[in-house]
A protein has these predicted regions:
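Short, glycine-anchored, charge-dense loop/turn motifs used at functional sites
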Residues: 482-487
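Alpha-helical scaffold elements lining the catalytic groove of polysaccharide deacetylases
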Residues: 195-210
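Acidic/aromatic-lined carbohydrate-recognition and catalytic surfaces
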Residues: 23-190, 229-250, 255
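Active-site-proximal helices and loops of the catalytic beta/alpha 8
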Residues: 24-41, 64-70, 88-91, 97, ...
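Sec/Tat signal peptide C-region and signal peptidase I cleavage site
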Residues: 18-22
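Positively charged n-region of N-terminal signal peptides that target proteins for export
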Residues: 1-4
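Residue-level detector of functionally pivotal "anchor" positions at catalytic/ligand-binding pockets or at interdomain
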Residues: 448-473
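Bacterial N-terminal signal peptides
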Residues: 7-16
Length: 490
């Protein structure tokens, strides 16, 4: 009887845990997804300056690359698609129901989303709710038409009371009476546009309608929330509950303590970009490989036991080549990704990121610069089934080197980065990839014995012939065709 009772209690505890996990909106459990940030700063512009190195990323341009994107990525993060044209990158858009932007027309955007969906790739909308651009003066706004979700025209009463528009003499609402303003900001101020008062029912209804419209009308699958330092996390939870996105990621460029606070405010109904993990990757550049260890100060959400909520990255549109706009946050010493040195740094960081827990987000300039190598690492991650909650079984760092063993759904990997020499294949493993300057990164793989038709095959094989069919990557090797998990297809 006692054993039965213990068994029942254990079952109930597991069931409760599973229910709690299921209730985390926008946080897929044990998520195997790999994400692509499909833009960089000003990459909508015609080829000039930096843009000529990495290519333009308007909707029309990305449409030409959907086959390669579908093969390698599960989620693609788009820039803000709200318009109208003339709003640049889009982080101070003026009319959210207008999806004609500097990135392209609404029709091309819809065509691109449909093309990615055909390859089972999900699309992440960049959602800016903290602030918005104005219409003709500092304090009026375009009307948004969200179809069955409603029509909304915000006013100066929906602007935060302490916004600079009320204290700048050039503003049309300078010195407005408090009764004609919103409440005080619930987060940090952004002085580039009007900060919206999320305690306001009008702002809440507008935000919920926009989120629902993006998913159900525009057919996005999830959200990347911009500037979430600017409003309390309870409101983000409210908007996610209204829309129910597949995945939600908060941009919270701050300390681990502040990120943990945000997750608590949202009741863990979002993920966050792991900025502290990004900073730990600089150890590869400066030779301090110990920074990659979990027990180090800057190792991010994994150190806090929150890897499930981490979206890891090396660089993004704000940290890469912003002309000093955000200080010295770029991963590589320069933006010259044709440099052998920078390539070596990025590929080591990619090998680390793509073999570790969290949901890895590959930056577009890195992908287009080192497509073959990064695609190869992605395929290894997918073959082993590394996921957002994968256990790091062991890790060790020494002078100029780091290695770790990670458990996936279908196998284990050992990743080594740095100055290893005369490496021998660990017992029970096979070499999956070796690359970089003098083997600066190496991955070994050991597949679980069940369910794998040919566990000895290294994929993707440099000897095999890769081809794409119905948006999926296959490799012909000898007499057989294999998928990226090593299973014999024919």
């Amino acid at each position: 009887m006692k054993k039965n009772l213990i068994g029942i209690l254990s079952f109930l505890m597991l069931t409760s845990a599973n229910v709690l996990r299921a209730e985390n909106i926008g946080v897929p459990a044990e998520c195997e997804d790999v994400m692509l940030q499909a833009f960089y700063w000003n990459s909508y512009m015609a080829e000039s300056g930096t843009n000529s190195k990495f290519g333009r990323t308007k909707w029309l341009d990305l449409l030409r690359d959907t086959a390669a994107i579908n093969v390698n990525f599960d989620v693609v993060w788009f820039p803000p698609s709200a318009g109208p044209t003339g709003c640049g990158v889009g982080y101070s858009a003026k009319q959210y129901s207008n999806q004609d932007s500097d990135w392209g027309t609404k029709n091309k955007l819809t065509e691109l989303i449909n093309a990615l969906h055909k390859g089972n790739t999900k699309v992440l909308a960049d959602v800016v709710l903290n602030h918005r651009g104005n219409l003709t003066n500092w304090c009026n706004f375009f009307t948004d038409y969200f179809g069955s979700y409603g029509t909304f025209t915000l006013t100066q009463k929906e602007i935060c009371r302490n916004d600079e528009c009320f204290t700048n003499s050039k503003s049309s609402c300078y010195g407005a009476d408090y009764k004609d303003r919103g409440a005080n900001d619930t987060g940090d101020n952004f002085d580039g546009a009007r900060d919206l008062d999320h305690t306001s029912e009008a702002v809440q209804n507008w935000s919920k309608a926009y989120a629902q419209w993006l998913l159900n009308t525009m057919k996005y699958d999830g959200f990347r929330y911009d500037m979430t330092l600017g409003f309390h996390g309870q409101y983000l939870k409210m908007y996610n509950e209204a829309a129910n996105p597949y995945i939600s990621v908060s941009e919270l460029w701050s300390s681990i303590a502040r990120q943990k606070q945000h997750l608590q405010e949202c009741e863990y109904n979002t993920m966050v970009f792991d900025f502290q993990n990004k900073y730990s990757l600089k150890g590869i550049v400066d030779g301090s490989y110990g920074k990659l260890n979990k027990d180090k100060t800057y190792n991010g959400l994994r150190k806090e036991g929150l890897a499930r909520y981490a979206v890891t990255f090396i660089d993004n549109h704000d940290t890469f080549d912003r002309g000093g706009a955000y200080g010295d946050n770029q991963f590589t010493p320069s933006t010259d990704l044709s440099s052998a040195t920078n390539k070596n740094y990025v590929l080591q960081a990619s090998a680390y990121m793509l073999m570790m827990p969290g949901v890895p987000c590959v930056f577009y300039p890195h992908w287009v610069s080192y497509k073959e190598e990064i695609n190869e690492l992605i395929a290894i991650r997918k073959r082993a089934g590394i996921h957002s909650e994968s256990e790091v079984l062991a890790e060790e760092s020494g002078q100029y080197k780091y290695h770790a063993t990670i458990q996936g759904h279908r196998g284990k990997v050992i990743v080594r980065v740095g100055k290893y020499r005369s490496q021998t294949v660990p017992e029970g493993y096979e070499l999956a990839v070796e690359g970089g300057d003098r083997g600066a990164y190496t991955v070994y793989i050991a597949m679980n014995p069940q369910g794998i038709a040919n566990p000895s095959l290294t994929l993707p094989s440099r000897e095999g012939k890769k081809f794409v069919e119905n948006g999926k990557l296959y490799i012909r090797h000898g007499e057989h065709v294999y998928d990226i998990f090593g299973r014999i297809i024919q």
